[in-house]
Amino acid sequence: MKQILFNSLKNEEVFSVLIKWKNNLYYTGYYYDEDGNDYLFNDLENIKCFKTFDELVSFCGQNNLLLNKDVSKYDFDIMLTNPIDYSDALNKWNILNTISLNLNIVFEGNENKYTEVYNYLFSCNFAIEQLPPLYKIPNKYFKLIISVFNNQNEVLDKLLYSNDNI
């Protein structure tokens, strides 16, 4: 794997990510650049993953990065149901988008036909009147969300299995 370059790193603070998929755990980190864009630890071809949180901590120490100890968790082994945890669905959608952008691959959720459902999930998170954590959404939106997550494997395969980064 090529050396990870932290181009335009806004500061030395990075954030930890835990992805659970196919009963395996993968840790990585992300950071923001000066323009507010977020990047996973990558070398433009692969995203650097670690088997344990301690390995992530060690990597950050070796690279003089301040690791925020809060861990963003994404469990892709949990099947979506309706009523849906709209916050979890939106967060998973966003991390899949970030992975795809970092690896320059297609993520189905970025297609125009999904803009309306993404905006709906986003509005549930920031509704004026707070919604319950599990919220029954219209079936037309739920079917589109399921379609996006049924096609997540290509993005996760590229992240976790297409290289020797673990």
Annotate the PLM regions:
Residues 59-98:
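ADP-ribosyltransferase catalytic core
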Residues 90-166:
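A eukaryote-biased signal for long
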Residues 1-67:
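Short N-terminal edge-element motif at the start of the domain
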Residues 1, 5, 56, 60, ...:
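Generic structural signal of hydrophobic/aromatic residues within well-ordered alpha-helices
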Residues 33-38, 43, 54, 70, ...:
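Acidic-enriched, low-complexity/disordered segments with a strong bias for Aspartate over Glutamate
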Residues 2, 10, 20-22, 48-51, ...:
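Context-gated lysine
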